[in-house]
């Protein structure tokens, strides 16, 4: 079965310079939710219109694209993809702004369509407040009556048309061009194709979220909240502990291992993988990173980093792109790393910047250490070998190498390589001037300062 996704609408109520269908929901463009589901059934095509170039950049390359330059209704959109309609197979119609339609529901729809041998199978839903929706009217044949055309009796019907259909390709091809635009809007409505057949069946879903469209940012937020709840509940059923699901935001693309604990106000985004027995949060953001087992990340930000097993990060740490922490590393408060590999059992506990650095195993980085990696034109590397001890308040001016088991004195500015097993000092010698304060104040240690 092929799928044609209609996604050419203007999306005016979003009040955005971006097409509606590329707005992200839990890390994934809205239309890609639909495409990923549709791909389970076969080949996928999309009908685009408004700012189609932007949409084309986010959808997979194997999706066929058709353009609807003028938005003249749903039937007109299908006509734009006329060549995509199969002659001997079925066609599923979906919408780029209805992101959460499920595979299971569509599979039921397909099963009913095949078993009933219908020309059209309609997905319906029951709404307590169906105002604004087309009603399913059951008589000698099934009809769809739009809300604006419904009398009081029909308006009491709670079964509505979701706009999702499966057509026999042959029937659709033979009749789509018969649809007229003799209505106030001068548009071609796909529902009008029902005039050409009595061979219609329906399937009803009781999950309203999966057939709810996004028209504005309020609906976008509501749908995202509902889906976030489902994602968090799925993770909890799989063995993840989420202390407060309502305050935790996890993208659909994230993977988390068993017995990991997620504390409140944590954001886990993109292609992130987290192992087992970790503690994440509170107040932590992790994006596009790979984290091993038994890792603690507390009140910190991690992006495009690799963290191996048994590592501790935070509080108030920032791991930037290219950071690789090997097992048993400790990164403490107010430490920032970027494009740095930090070896096993190494510690950087306080107030440190490590950029473009390669650091060995069992190294101690003293508080206040800075790798001075940028000379105003280009970045330079710092190398610190196994067992080195970097004193507090050090500036390591790259390019520079600290050898194996070498030590640098506290307060040093290191501008030259320090050989292994050596001590590097780069600071002014302390001078003590006795009784300087007394002489400065004319011999009166408690003299008041002049106003």
Swiss-Prot record:
Region annotation (Linker) ranges: 218-238
Annotated GO biological process: cell morphogenesis; cell wall organization; lipid A biosynthetic process; peptidoglycan biosynthetic process; regulation of cell shape; UDP-N-acetylglucosamine biosynthetic process
Highest taxon, organism lineage: Bacteria
Keyword tags: Acyltransferase, Cell shape, Cell wall biogenesis/degradation, Cytoplasm, Magnesium, Metal-binding, Multifunctional enzyme, Nucleotidyltransferase, Peptidoglycan synthesis, Repeat, Transferase
Binding sites annotated in the UniProt record for Mg(2+): 97, 215
UniProt xrefs under Pfam families: Hexapep, NTP_transf_3
Cofactor note: Binds 1 Mg(2+) ion per subunit.
Sequence positions that bind acetyl-CoA: 367, 373-374, 392, 410, 427
Binding residues annotated for UDP-N-acetyl-alpha-D-glucosamine, in chain numbering: 6-9, 20, 68, 73-74, 95-97, 134, 146, 161, 215, 320, 338, 353, 364
Pathway(s) of this molecule: Nucleotide-sugar biosynthesis; UDP-N-acetyl-alpha-D-glucosamine biosynthesis; N-acetyl-alpha-D-glucosamine 1-phosphate from alpha-D-glucosamine 6-phosphate (route II): step 2/2; Nucleotide-sugar biosynthesis; UDP-N-acetyl-alpha-D-glucosamine biosynthesis; UDP-N-acetyl-alpha-D-glucosamine from N-acetyl-alpha-D-glucosamine 1-phosphate: step 1/1; Bacterial outer membrane biogenesis; LPS lipid A biosynthesis
Assembly mode: Homotrimer.
Protein name (Swiss-Prot/TrEMBL): Bifunctional protein GlmU
Annotated organism of origin: Thermosipho africanus (strain TCF52B)
